[in-house]
């Protein structure tokens, strides 16, 4: 980041912010340390600051002037053994032994992100449906509805 002449966008699998589910906490253990380093970089280099961090687990929030944005998985949401449900044929279940612990999407989820020099991040929305019952129809915790859904939310964020 020290050598770039441009704004910085990070991509990671695990989030650089944190959120708690009924089973576990998602995010890196040292997320606070990383956030502090990024915010310090922004303080020292406002002309080439970190504007966003994209990941695949949590949601969108602005922390210290940096957008931490999750993009829902392309294929499914992991539910775990407590929510086992066979959604496909016995053959598919046999060949993909973990699939019964997921809530798969009918179609792949993907999006486009436009980052503009006018200080905006535009995320195109995309919707699909669950294959079979939703996680919540299987008893998945209702308080996780803001994070577990078969769509990517359309957003316009300012940085």
Set out the residue ranges of the language-model regions.
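Binuclear metal-dependent phosphoesterase catalytic core
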Residues: 61-159
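Active-site-proximal segments of metal-dependent phosphoesterases and phosphodiesterases across multiple
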Residues: 2-54, 63-64
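Acidic carboxylate-rich catalytic motifs and surrounding loops in phosphoryl-/glycosyl-chemistry enzymes
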Residues: 51-58, 126-128
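Active-site metal-binding loops of divalent metal-dependent hydrolases
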Residues: 14, 56-58, 73-74
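Intrinsically disordered, low-complexity regions enriched in small/polar residues
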Residues: 8, 21, 28-36, 40, ...
């Amino acid at each position: 980041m020290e050598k770039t002449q441009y704004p910085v966008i990070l991509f990671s699998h695990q989030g650089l912010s944190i959120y708690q589910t009924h089973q576990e906490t998602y995010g890196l253990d040292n997320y606070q340390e990383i956030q502090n380093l990024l915010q310090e970089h922004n303080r020292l280099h406002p002309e080439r600051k970190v504007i966003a961090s994209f990941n695949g687990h949590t949601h969108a929030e602005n922390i210290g002037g940096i957008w931490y944005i999750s993009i829902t998985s392309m294929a499914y949401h992991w539910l775990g053994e407590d929510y086992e449900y066979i959604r496909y044929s016995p053959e598919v279940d046999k060949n993909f032994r973990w699939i019964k612990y997921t809530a798969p999407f009918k179609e792949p989820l993907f999006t486009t992100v436009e980052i503009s020099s006018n200080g905006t991040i535009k995320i195109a929305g995309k919707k699909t449906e669950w294959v079979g019952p939703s996680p919540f129809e299987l008893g998945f915790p209702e308080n996780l509805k803001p994070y577990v859904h078969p769509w990517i939310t359309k957003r316009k964020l300012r940085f």
